[in-house]
Structures are given as C-alpha cells and as structure tokens.
Amino acid sequence: MATVAITPDQNAVFGEIFIAAPPARVFEAITDPQQMAKWWGQDGIYRLTECKADVRPGGKWSSIGVNADGTSFEVDGEYLEVDPPRLLVHTWNPSWTHPIKTVVRWELEPQSVHGLHPNGPRKAGTGTLLKVRQEGFAGEPAAAAGHAKGWKLVLGWAQAFVEKGETVDTREAISA
C-alpha cells in the first residue's frame, strides 16, 4: 500500500510504494506512453485516453484524459532529468488547478525480495521502492491536498499493473 504525505510547509507531496519487480520494469511502466494509458486511472475517478512521451532531458510529455463526469483534462511537461532505471524528473503542468508549474521527481531504488509479499508468495529476487515527490505548491494547500490523494491512487495503480497486469479496463470501477 502506498504511503503519501504533504510537507509541513505544504510545498511538496511525497509518497512511496514497494513494487515486486526490478527497477527497469517499473521505469518502463512509468515512461512508456502505451503502458501508462493502460494503468493510469480508474473508471469512476478518471482515466487517461492518450499519452505521449519523448523520454530524454528536454523532451516533452503530455497526457489527455477524461474525468468521471465526462469532462476532459490535460497535463503536460518537460523531462529535466532521465537516468534509467533509477531517476526521472519532469515538470507537471495540469489544466485543472493552480497556474504554478510543479516538478515531479520519481526515484526507483532496488530492493531485495524474500519470501512473502502482501500480494502472495514471491521468488527471491529484486523489487523496487518507487518514490515520488512533487514540489511547487507554495500558497496552494488545496492543490497539494488534491495531488496527495491522486498520488496515493497512482502509486497503487502502478503497483497493480506491474505486479498483476491490472489495467483500467480490468480494475473495478468506483461508483459515484
């Protein structure tokens, strides 16, 4: 299960989750546009319908999606740092909240896997501690709180996709 919190100054949201897969596999899931469109979302909340990514420093990325009420949204940005499979840093420019650009930092730390995992027995091998930190919410506590809720979902969706192949289409919808 993901843990997510907001810094005391409400400038940043940070979270982490363990994923029972090597960092290279997790990095692929968070950077490949086709995979992201499969796992990022849940009917009854929102879902991505289109993703584009030029995963290199200076490269651009964008996502288009639809909310549960049928309204669309967009988010885009630029990659600042790309160091597969351990680090990804990009700007985050949403169409739905504050006008401030934030920066998202993904860190992927290799972890040893031994014995049981909450999702069942696993072979000994490698896993990944996936950490995310989004900064730049100064003066926007409501935006920080909203993004904290979102990151908790996103980290869980990423884990379910990488570990079990769960997608938006196979995940149970949330009823409004």
Residues of each region from the PLM?
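Glycine-rich portal/gate segments that line the openings of hydrophobic small-molecule binding cavities
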Residues: 48-91, 117
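Hydrophobic ligand-binding cavity/cleft-lining segments
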Residues: 1-46, 176
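Residues at helix-coil transition
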Residues: 31-32, 41, 84, 156, ...
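Beta-strand/loop substructures that line and gate deep hydrophobic ligand-binding cavities in soluble
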Residues: 16, 89-152, 158, 171
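A generic structural micro-feature
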Residues: 7-9, 53, 69-73, 96-100, ...
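Short, highly charged C-terminal tails/helix-capping segments
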Residues: 160-176
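Hydrophobic pocket/interface hotspot
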Residues: 26-27, 36, 61, 79, ...
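Short, surface-exposed coil-to-beta transition loops
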Residues: 14, 48, 72-76, 99-105
